[in-house]
Amino acid sequence: MSGDDCVIEAKSARRQGRLSDATALYEEAAESFQAENQLARWAHALRHAAEFAVRAGDSPRGLREAQIVVEYYRSSPPPTLEMANALRVMALAEMAAGENDSAVSHWIEARELYLHAGVADGVLEADRRVAVLAAVA
């Protein structure tokens, strides 16, 4: 299946609540895009795989994939919103793994990028998540 076909199937799985299937399909899409040397699309698909792994309860897998995406973006700076979204997924994975200090740092960094990109919902989510983490510290 092509990367594009995998993305279409992953979106369908996500809408149906089949998060583990969505994760696997996004991973397959990422592999396809990487093989085609479409690195921006690879990172984007892998970020989605990471998020759905976390949502499906597999925080180690989500964290591992999110770290790969953030490391790639730090070496090849993407558009601001792509980096903000990658940091958001990284922070979600860290929260799920109990790595709250790292999660706070990544939420703060994502917040600044969302602010710069003019994404008010991203700023609000980051503020809310940092407040929750501060309350449990």
Model-derived features with residue positions:
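Amphipathic alpha-helical segments of tetratricopeptide repeats
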Residues: 27-32, 67-75, 109-119
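Residue register of alpha-helical TPR repeats
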Residues: 4, 24, 44, 85, ...
